[in-house]
Amino acid sequence: MKAISEINKILKLNDDQTQLIKSHLIKNTLSKNDQFLRLDSRNDKIGFIDKGLLRSFSYDDAGNEITHDFFQQGSFFTDLNSYFNCTLSKVFIEALVDCDLYVFNRTSLDIIKKEIPEWASFEQIYRAQISMCLLNFQRKIIHSSSIDSFTLFSNCLLYTSDAADEVD
């Protein structure tokens, strides 16, 4: 399972821990343009992209879409601010192609944190890595349109070319 492999890059899980995590991952599929998260909604989940591509965005005062990030196959994703601060989301997260996801809800993660004390360290390290990637990406696209920012991203895709072919 790709999600377990990604976790094991930072936190080496034993067999019992692996089974615990697998038991709390919920399979979810999104069709192209489906929303994983809506603006002004409570975010109580963290996802992992087994297959597909997601985008987070919001609208400016003039109604223009502002892309904040792309989430690619093999990565965890969420609205970090909304999840960790228990605030309403300031972004939408939508599928750019059909996606296969695995999702943790907050209750499951609380159980995992209780059973695997090292999980808090994993979250900190992963959150720092994601935040740095997001900051670097945002620096590159701050003055770009949605189309230009997607072009920038598509030039450095690290996942299968099948997903890239599905994006129009």
Where are these regions (language model features)?
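Cytosolic regulatory regions built on CNB/CRP/Popeye-like sensor folds
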Residues: 1-158
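Single conserved hydrophobic/aromatic residue that forms the stacking wall/gate
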Residues: 159-168
